[in-house]
Amino acid sequence: MKKIAVLTSGGDVPGMNAAIRAVVRKAAFHGINVVGIKHGYEGLVKGYLEELDLGSVGGIIQRGGTHLNSARCPEFKEDAVQQQGIENLRAAGIEGLVVIGGDGSYRGAMDLVKKGFPAVGVPGTIDNDVPGTEYTIGFDTALNTVVESIDKIRDTATSHENSFIVEVMGRDAGDIALWAGLAAGAETVLIPEEDYDLDDIVARLDRGAARGKKHSIIIVAEGVMSGNELAKLIKEKTGKETRVSVLGHIQRGGSPTARDRVLASQFGAHAVELLMEGKYGRAVGIRNHQVIDYDMPEAFEKNHEADVSLYTLMKELSI
């Protein structure tokens, strides 16, 4: 194998640049050239290619976002569009592709594999919702951003004796909400994987107030409902106002944590090894502190499951 390509797809996450860097440097170590595909699958179809070398990836490991830009490309589901992408790759002499992204990105990569083009996947999503791996690139940074934000919100909540609802990302997965809730000492956490009980939420707030607590923090993943919707339900139930803070896209940005940089470096390097070994249609992941790989369809054919033990602990500690 003499030339491979790398692209980032879907939502950007901190650590993608570290993964791109690792792909380029690992490939260079083995004498393999790397081409970067700009703007994800859209760039693959439109031929937005650029040569990457050691200089191209110098000084990017600490940067958030993605050096290659990212975009969503719904039309890539079409056979003719996929075939155009493969033709562009082959015309450029590219023999394998590393795709960094979430389950949707993996589906696109697997479509290429089914059409005979070698591709492997690297998990990059702040939601930490790719089945088969315990952690994804970007989750740790996003989690730290959320916890830091909640700490600051709690400062003002304490000063003004207010209750706050903090809405975080997580359309189908509640890992950010759950982990942040435990780390920030939230009174209540609502995640998509578990049913919520409004009476229980109110009871928890009342128990805190009964022992003299003047403020509280409720975290809700966007996939459950919006923070404003929850505030309305609580007011209808109790007559009390709760402030709402929607963290939004701040969760995607920022310099990646050391953990995300290391994880991304391990994942990117292992992806190159898979291509060199002729192991296509594989996804990189980590389990029990070991970098592993597994069949890519497992990453999008199974549903993400929340850590039940963490959820139970969260409820026990927020009595």
UniProtKB/Swiss-Prot annotation:
Binding site for substrate: 125-127, 169-171, 222, 243, 249-252
Cofactors: Mg(2+)
Gene3D superfamilies attached to this UniProt entry: 3.40.50.450, Phosphofructokinase domain
Annotated protein name in UniProt: ATP-dependent 6-phosphofructokinase
Any Gene Ontology CC annotation: 6-phosphofructokinase complex
Residues at which ATP binds: 11, 72-73, 102-105
Purpose of the protein: Catalyzes the phosphorylation of D-fructose 6-phosphate to fructose 1,6-bisphosphate by ATP, the first committing step of glycolysis.
Protein's organism: Lysinibacillus sphaericus
Residue positions of the active site: 127
Top-level taxon of origin: Bacteria
Self-association and partners: Homotetramer.
Enzyme Commission designation: 2.7.1.11
